[in-house]
Amino acid sequence: MKQPWVRFAFVVIALAAAAAVVIGDVRRSAAERKLREAILTELQPVVLKNCTLKRFGSENDGGYLMCENLIEPLDTGYSYGVGSNDDWGCEVSRRYHVPVHEYDCFDPARPICNGAKFIFHNECVGDRTGYRDSHFFDTLENQISKNGDAGRRVLVKMDIEGGEWDSLLAAPDELLASIPQLAMEMHGFDDPKILEVLRKLNRNFHLVNLHFNNWSCTSRAAPLPAWAYQVLWVNKRIGIVDPMAPVPAPMSPLNAPDSPTWRDCQLHTSKPAR
């Protein structure tokens, strides 16, 4: 039979171990919350004095806001993550009579758009060149260069389910500085590289629109209302910030729920942007 002090020691050790687990969980939870708060701090949209917003693409999921008056002159478009539908690329190609390069290495479906010029590439954008399983990836810089578009005026739309972080982290600042507008959906809230990419983008662009995808509403992302969000980045070379407008800028009424039937979840702002 064990001595009482031995049993007592076991109890103390067990309680200490349990306390260490709880303390570790609390610290981890606090660190994760701090990361999400830092991400939200980087997602502060501004109003541009010289931007007329217009929605391009679908009425709901698949629609993106851009500064219509800052698009031309335009040489070509790049659409990453297309699947069977690319209303954004369709509208850009038809409206501005330019080709749109379509990239997707996972979904074999190819969108059709009468009157548009689509150039399909069975590859994805990533942080390096090469195959991952049977899927070929290349960098944003290489893809633009291979198509002869280096130094040309291009629009970029990106919805690649989390692959944006590595892809943009690998993109040189010089390349990002040459892109007038970048419309995209971003995914995630718990990876430190998200913060690194957002800070990199904020060096080169103004964040002009922020809309959360209501397919992804979750309290786990708080203070973010969802884990996926559409954004518009406008190059600082062409965008002029309105110093009299509030920051963060109120959300434009041109935004629409990705799902018209699910409850929406947006950050609260005082009034619609003009």
List where the protein language model places each region:
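N-terminal secretory signal peptides that target proteins for export/translocation
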Residues: M1-K2
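Phosphate/nucleotide-binding beta-alpha loop and adjacent structural elements of enzyme active sites
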Residues: W5-L15, A19-R274
